[in-house]
């Protein structure tokens, strides 16, 4: 499964409350601060077997490494990955992840309220995720139909089960390939 990587850099207007604001922002969404050094912060979200099926994309396994350079420059390295069977690539949600970090910049520099904006991002992510799950279910149903036809034609019961698995995996592979290509092209323009 292709992972999502992004690096964002921005200038900070006021450095006095930078670390506490960064901690507030990420901890409000359930990230855990595991490293808190002078010029570096690391926030993580641990993985579970169900990461790819979680509707809230901010609950997927993630690592956010923040470097403070020259006291007024912040560099964020954001990595999201999903593991296991039946997952949607995090690359499909790259625009939502970018907006999430843009909201951080607005919060740090302009003290803008981010909670309602991030809740809206989570809602959009859930809607996208439900659409992708519906496509997977459609693929399973198509595989079930084809498997049943083959089972009835040959009398081999195993072909019915095999149709479901093939329907699911082929839908997952085609959908992820399309989503990766679509999002990669959007970011290269």
Model feature map: region roles:
Residues 1-7, 15-131, 142-151, 167-189:
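Ser/Thr-rich, low-complexity intrinsically disordered terminal regions
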Residues 136-141, 161-165, 169:
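Alpha-helical transmembrane spans of integral membrane proteins, capturing the lipid-embedded, hydrophobic core
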Residues 149-165:
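Hydrophobic alpha-helical transmembrane segments
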């Amino acid at each position: 499964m292709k992972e999502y990587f992004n690096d964002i850099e921005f200038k900070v207007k006021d450095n006095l409350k930078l670390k506490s604001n960064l901690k507030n922002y990420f901890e409000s969404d359930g990230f855990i601060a595991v490293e808190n050094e002078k010029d570096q912060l690391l926030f993580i979200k641990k993985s579970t077997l169900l990461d790819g099926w979680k509707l809230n994309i901010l609950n997927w396994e993630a690592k956010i490494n923040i470097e403070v350079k020259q006291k007024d420059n912040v560099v964020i390295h954001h990595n999201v990955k999903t593991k296991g069977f039946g997952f949607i690539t995090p690359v499909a949600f790259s625009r939502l992840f970018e907006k999430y970090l843009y909201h951080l910049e607005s919060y740090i520099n302009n003290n803008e309220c981010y909670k309602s904006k991030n809740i809206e991002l989570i809602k959009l992510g859930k809607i996208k995720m439900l659409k992708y799950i519906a496509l997977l279910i459609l693929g399973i149903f198509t595989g079930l139909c084809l498997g049943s036809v083959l089972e009835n034609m040959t009398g081999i019961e195993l072909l019915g089960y095999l149709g479901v698995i093939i329907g699911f995996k082929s839908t997952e592979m085609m959908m992820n390939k399309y989503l990766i290509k679509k999002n990669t092209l959007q970011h290269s323009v």
